[in-house]
Amino acid sequence: MNCRVKICGITNLDDAMVACRYGADALGFVFYEKSPRYVAPDMANAIVAQLPPFIIPVALFVDADTSLVNSVISGSSRWTIQFHGSESESECISYQRPYIKALRIQRGDDVAALVDQYPSASAMLLDAYKAGVPGGTGEVFDWSLIPIGLSKPIVLAGGLTPSNVKQAIKQVKPYAVDVSGGVELSKGIKSEPLVQEFISGAKCG
């Protein structure tokens, strides 16, 4: 089965359409104002309204106020939510949308136990840990820390690029891979050749 691909940090319609054209399965939109890839809710919903069928838009939040989450997801029934902070399972499930919970992995973590704290999640995203940074570090973590047989589908993130995505899929065998900085010209602006190369590598990996 082909690995799915999420292109994260979408900030404009052109990049969204490029990702769709080359076979992305999901697009991530960052609603964390401290991120250089932040996009305003109205802009994101305008982009989502123009996406082709079967493309999943993913709304990324970091310990966000309920009002912000609701202001985004009320704009489209298509949204899946990605929680990238310290949200509890009860918080995640309260919005009654499919959700992905991100975990920042570091040595010594009981990854299986952390995953099991979110039985209602559609998938778990595993990212690199960096103190004080909720995600988007551009750093690869030690994939050997991921145990076999986790209870949820895994979305692998953290420093993925066109040059390492095949090896990542071969070693980890994730349900999906997630990339942002690894396919950018600058923060928030995607490179069409890199997007094409990454998706091709992931789908053929």
UniProtKB/Swiss-Prot annotation:
Q: Name one GO molecular function term.
A: phosphoribosylanthranilate isomerase activity
Q: Write the record's keywords in alphabetical order, separated by commas.
A: Amino-acid biosynthesis, Aromatic amino acid biosynthesis, Isomerase, Tryptophan biosynthesis
Question: Pfam families, per this entry?
Answer: PRAI (PF00697)
The Enzyme Commission number assigned here is 5.3.1.24
Note the superkingdom of the native organism.
Bacteria
Q: Which reaction(s) does its UniProt entry say it catalyses?
A: N-(5-phospho-beta-D-ribosyl)anthranilate = 1-(2-carboxyphenylamino)-1-deoxy-D-ribulose 5-phosphate
Keyword match Isomerase: yes
Sorted alphabetically, which InterPro entries does this protein's record hold? Aldolase_TIM, PRAI_dom, RibuloseP-bd_barrel, TrpF_fam
Task: Mention one GO biological process in which this protein takes part, according to its record.
Answer: L-tryptophan biosynthetic process
Keyword Amino-acid biosynthesis tagged: yes
Q: In which pathway does it act?
A: Amino-acid biosynthesis; L-tryptophan biosynthesis; L-tryptophan from chorismate: step 3/5
Q: Which family does it belong to?
A: Belongs to the TrpF family.
Read off the HAMAP family from this record. PRAI
Q: What is this protein called?
A: N-(5'-phosphoribosyl)anthranilate isomerase
Origin species = Marinomonas sp. (strain MWYL1)
Q: What is the lineage of its organism?
A: Bacteria, Pseudomonadati, Pseudomonadota, Gammaproteobacteria, Oceanospirillales
Q: Which gene encodes it?
A: trpF
